[in-house]
Amino acid sequence: MKVSILSFDLSDNATGRADLLARLLAPRWAVEVVGPRFGARVWRPARDGAVIYRDVAVDAARRYPRFAAMWGDLAARADGDVLLASKPRPTSYGVALLARRRRRRPLLLDIDDWEVGFFRRSGAWGTLGRSLNLGNPNGLPWTWLMERMVARADAVMVASRFLQGRFGGTLVPHVRDTEAWDPARYDRGEARARLGLRDERVVMFLGTPRAHKGVDDLVEAVGVVGSDARLVLVGADPASEAGRRWAAHPWVRLVGEIPFDDVPRYLVAADAVAVPQRATSDTVGQVPAKVFDAMALGRPIVATAVSMLPEILDGCGVLVPPGDVVALATALRRLLGDPDGSAELGRRARERCRERYSFTAARAVLFPLVERAAASR
């Protein structure tokens, strides 16, 4: 049996969830990820991994009406026996609905973000403007329509309790391969040398540093932690406006996007990992996948109390109020000043990850969902 996973833009970081689902399913079924590519190449962290991608270059046809000609090709490439749409977006879930209409197959929908929430960050007037943007295939009007059609899927999976309350479905959080990502397998000294670090105390942020991720708060917080504290931002574009602004601070070091499989080789260098989400419509339903990177690798974590993070890190992480730079700096200073306590916190985080947020835990839920869907054909 073959599973086709549909992603709405293979050049975007949303590819990360599709890549994870493919890795989870691959031991049991043939899997490939299908979708349009609005950028020049497949998203860098996923590009050279084990997952098979069948991307369709959009080029000049990125808006309606020209994009309408792409739908048939995208639906034809989703030729699996089971369809799994990643996100309720038109160019993933919408294409999956069309593919199912052409040839009846089970369709599962995976929701890992509140997509309409992303359009609300600019307030009422910004939302109004976006609601009139009919030319964007994944714009607000069409994404809103997809969320109204969630019930048409044969099964729904969600990545957070907020999303479960809004859309129903089975909870399948982001997870990590805790066997492959065993910190004992990676050389911490080598990782620090790669970053040009010696005895400095290192705080690390890993991910796509968008505004709602709270990186500005983190840069400010680390700046007051102490003269030997360094902040390493992995995944930040040094050439971007924000990247240049952050790099102007002497305590900040930037590393561009890295392959997903290289994450442990960088993250083990950290003395603490920060997940400083802000409280916005972007983050209310979001659980940052990178918190599980840190947990799997036994890193001490400081996070803001947003979405499911208090539940996930209960007893194995430090929580601070979102947007509170003073509280964030205080928590980081405490972790960096207590190596033994930090190590114990990291140990508990890894154990929690193995129990609840590992590949084994996710497959125990995901495999039966796919099997039930396949049996309904």
Model-predicted regions and their roles:
Residues 241-267:
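Nucleotide-activated donor-binding/catalytic signature segment of Leloir-type glycosyltransferases, i.e.
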Residues 213, 259-266, 271-296, 303-311:
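Nucleotide-sugar-dependent
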Residues 162, 175:
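Carbohydrate-associated surface elements
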Residues 176-194, 242-244:
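Acidic anion/phosphate-binding donor-loop and adjacent secondary structure
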Residues 4-6, 197-213, 219-223, 232:
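Conserved donor-binding/catalytic core segment of Leloir-type glycosyltransferases
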